[in-house]
């Protein structure tokens, strides 16, 4: 049961990090004026 909980936490963390990374990487394409971050 503990292993299942750890696996669930890992999957949720991966999804959250992927969502945040995708949002940050697609942000400069939506705002062309903020190219200084690249």
Swiss-Prot record:
It comes from Synechocystis sp. (strain ATCC 27184 / PCC 6803 / Kazusa). GO terms for cellular component: photosystem II reaction center; plasma membrane-derived thylakoid membrane; plasma membrane-derived thylakoid photosystem II. It is a single-pass membrane protein. The chain crosses the membrane at residues 3-25. Disruption phenotype: Loss of about 25% of PSII activity, cells are slightly more photosensitive. Altered assembly of PSII, with destabilized binding of CP43 (psbC). Keywords: Formylation, Membrane, Photosynthesis, Photosystem II, Reaction center, Thylakoid, Transmembrane, Transmembrane helix. One of the components of the core complex of photosystem II (PSII). Not essential for assembly, it probably binds to D1 early in the assembly of PSII and stabilizes binding of CP43 (psbC) to the reaction center. PSII is a light-driven water:plastoquinone oxidoreductase that uses light energy to abstract electrons from H(2)O, generating O(2) and a proton gradient subsequently used for ATP formation. It consists of a core antenna complex that captures photons, and an electron transfer chain that converts photonic excitation into a charge separation. One of its GO terms (biological process) is photosynthesis. InterPro entries: PSII_PsbI (IPR003686), PSII_PsbI_sf (IPR037271). The modification N-formylmethionine is found at residue 1. Belongs to the PsbI family. It holds the Pfam family PsbI. This is Photosystem II reaction center protein I. PSII is composed of 1 copy each of membrane proteins PsbA, PsbB, PsbC, PsbD, PsbE, PsbF, PsbH, PsbI, PsbJ, PsbK, PsbL, PsbM, PsbT, PsbX, PsbY, PsbZ, Psb30/Ycf12, peripheral proteins PsbO, CyanoQ (PsbQ), PsbU, PsbV and a large number of cofactors. It forms dimeric complexes. The lineage of its organism: Bacteria, Bacillati, Cyanobacteriota, Cyanophyceae, Synechococcales. The keyword Secreted does not apply. It is found in: Cellular thylakoid membrane.
